[in-house]
Amino acid sequence: MHPSTFQTELNPHTSTLLKKLTHHSQQRNLVAGRAVHGQIIRTGASTCIQHANVLVNFYAKCGKLAKAHSIFNAIICKDVVSWNSLITGYSQNGGISSSYTVMQLFREMRAQDILPNAYTLAGIFKAESSLQSSTVGRQAHALVVKMSSFGDIYVDTSLVGMYCKAGLVEDGLKVFAYMPERNTYTWSTMVSGYATRGRVEEAIKVFNLFLREKEEGSDSDYVFTAVLSSLAATIYVGLGRQIHCITIKNGLLGFVALSNALVTMYSKCESLNEACKMFDSSGDRNSITWSAMVTGYSQNGESLEAVKLFSRMFSAGIKPSEYTIVGVLNACSDICYLEEGKQLHSFLLKLGFERHLFATTALVDMYAKAGCLADARKGFDCLQERDVALWTSLISGYVQNSDNEEALILYRRMKTAGIIPNDPTMASVLKACSSLATLELGKQVHGHTIKHGFGLEVPIGSALSTMYSKCGSLEDGNLVFRRTPNKDVVSWNAMISGLSHNGQGDEALELFEEMLAEGMEPDDVTFVNIISACSHKGFVERGWFYFNMMSDQIGLDPKVDHYACMVDLLSRAGQLKEAKEFIESANIDHGLCLWRILLSACKNHGKCELGVYAGEKLMALGSRESSTYVQLSGIYTALGRMRDVERVWKHMRANGVSKEVGCSWIELKNQYHVFVVGDTMHPMIEETKDLVCLVSRQMIEEGFVTVLDSSFVEEEEGTQLSTSFII
């Protein structure tokens, strides 16, 4: 039947069908609704605009937007209800694509001179909220004023939500202030507007105003849930407890959403015991309750407990949501539970969450932290729509696994895709620049941080300071450090480390004393940096003082890194016997690293007998590093013990240890040039060889002499001697 024949009359039978379809719309019962649709077609009532509008509404509410749009397009003389049915369907569906469709429908509606009503405007404002924009919404706001629709609580609440989600909280507050009446949704929208922007004080003020104005017996759980979501730091736990008491006083703990919000609040405020008590006392737990507690454990460093709780949830037959899976995946990332993470990946596929952005981001993060970058990349590539969190997870994964070049390539792709970076993104990219010691690129990234409005707060400030320091630009590093507000221990460590590694040990130690004077408590990394500074300066006594200071004054137990710094300190000072005694008295499991440091020092100082002792220790412990065998064989060669040299090489071959090829690189005009031993593939290898020969001749002319090191490097072609220049 041609669409132009749409009728308007209703008969008793079709009126009954209309009521049935409306009921199925409310229940989202797609199967039953389709059956009624079939009956409507058989009676010929589908030509009635009232039925067509209800059909559009039914399919839209059931998520079948393409079908709803098809029926809508068949209506020639559309009324405001027709437009509202489709606009509301798309706006409630959410998402960027649906929200843009709402904007297009609104333009078409205005072009056909259809005057919108309150429901139309509410749909527009909701869609603009999803886009976090207010461009079309402001035009619709002007229509609200023009049509005298201001005062409709449904429209005004949607308008407040649009402005708040677009970040224009002050504009939302203006609308809120002039509303003649407000319901609990209005109050919760305003509180959430401040809460999502981290403006806790303003959120609390609105909440207090609500408590004074709320009517007795009115539903207020949404408002309490909204204000609790704003309390996400330890300093707010006391305020959270007060709100908890008010919920008990008002008898609101029966609302599951509110109980979940309390569990989340206590978890974010690092009060895990209270979160557990709240979880245990929740009588009617749903998947959100379990997710909140799993995430709470994960965020508070109790990753193993998070995994155990998920097992309990699974055993209890509770179907997890994607957010539950995300919480457990994050826990597996933190404790390197790769096998469990893979099982969760399979479970995620079974539940159909593989295309969910949050779940995929957690998967990418888990695989990246476990070093499985190929799997992480597969997860990244399978999604068409990627947000900043997903890009950042993969970029930071490459940086953590020392694939800094790929991290920078991915960052360029991210910029090309128009994704605006966040703090963790920039911190990871700056770390990549630090590792590559590429100053010019680091300066460009610094420019990006300024362009995107990032300040020098943590972590950007400390990452910038580290980058400049590692690239040898200490003046710029110090300038960033001094301008960083609210410095944390990471900021101090970055600058101390930069000074130490650039030969300014005295300045590093002075900065450490300044750190103590300002009341900042040092951590493990701080002591690694200052003992390292003492090592490079030869301050043995001072190094001992700081090593003992860790446990005696700060209460930190020295770790392997601190013992390694002390062995290096003693070795550099020529106190090799003391270094050996220190290693043997160490009460921690240090593996091979301490003996490796001592072996290298013995070789440099010509202490052959002690070097043999350290080298044999390493061989007995099953060292897999070729340098151990190379250095030990060199010492035996110097002693003329050729049988031992042969024994060392046999042991090396038997253990499958091979000599790693030497590699170096330079940055020239924003391009990396990588060279390996025996390289003949570089396009400028001949020019490079000529330049090396020229520099070698100039070094000899300046008084440098070639010294043959007796360390043997065994290769398939034969035995090769390594050479180095000394003055």
Swiss-Prot record:
GO terms for molecular function: RNA binding. PROSITE patterns: PPR. The keyword Secreted does not apply. Keywords: Repeat. It comes from the Eukaryota. The keyword Repeat applies. NCBIfam families: PPR. This is Pentatricopeptide repeat-containing protein At2g33680. It comes from Arabidopsis thaliana (Mouse-ear cress). The gene is PCMP-E19.
